[in-house]
Amino acid sequence: MAPKAEKKPAEKAPAPKAEKKIAKEGGTSEIVKKKKKTKKSTETYKIYIFKVLKQVHPDIGISGKAMGIMNSFINDIFEKLAQESSRLARYNKKPTITSREIQTAVRLVLPGELAKHAVSEGTKAVTKFTSS
């Protein structure tokens, strides 16, 4: 029996780029390359939710549906905080939302113990940011 030749994986030829010929006044044509459509990036908190989950419970996973719910929850909370801090700035006739408005909004929107922890973590984050 003759030895079999080695098979190499089939190489794909590069796909031709989308080109369009446009006729000029002098009868010549010019090739114009079309730009590819870029994917619109949607910002989510999924990676951050996952990081926090692994810090709290390293052995537990989360389903895609639950991750979507958590992402919606965080968006809702941030929306409420933004509305409340905006309202506070308007009440005080201030053109800028500062950390003080955010802190007050957190105290108004979040309940009891959760607000205390959020304020302390926020203060810690602002201190770390300003010191660096």
From Swiss-Prot:
There is a cross-link at K128 (Glycyl lysine isopeptide (Lys-Gly) (interchain with G-Cter in ubiquitin)). It comes from the Eukaryota. Signal peptide: none annotated. GO terms for cellular component: nucleolus; nucleosome; plasma membrane. It is found in: Nucleus; Chromosome. Residues 1-11 have a biased composition (Basic and acidic residues). PROSITE patterns: HISTONE_H2B (PS00357). Keywords: Acetylation, Chromosome, DNA-binding, Isopeptide bond, Methylation, Nucleosome core, Nucleus, Ubl conjugation. The modification N,N,N-trimethylalanine is found at A2. SUPFAM superfamilies: Histone-fold (SSF47113). The modification N6-acetyllysine is found at K7, K12, K20, K21. Residues 1-41 are annotated as: Disordered. The modification N-methylalanine is found at A2. One of its GO terms (molecular function) is DNA binding. Core component of nucleosome. Nucleosomes wrap and compact DNA into chromatin, limiting DNA accessibility to the cellular machineries which require DNA as a template. Histones thereby play a central role in transcription regulation, DNA repair, DNA replication and chromosomal stability. DNA accessibility is regulated via a complex set of post-translational modifications of histones, also called histone code, and nucleosome remodeling. This is Histone H2B.9. It comes from Arabidopsis thaliana (Mouse-ear cress).
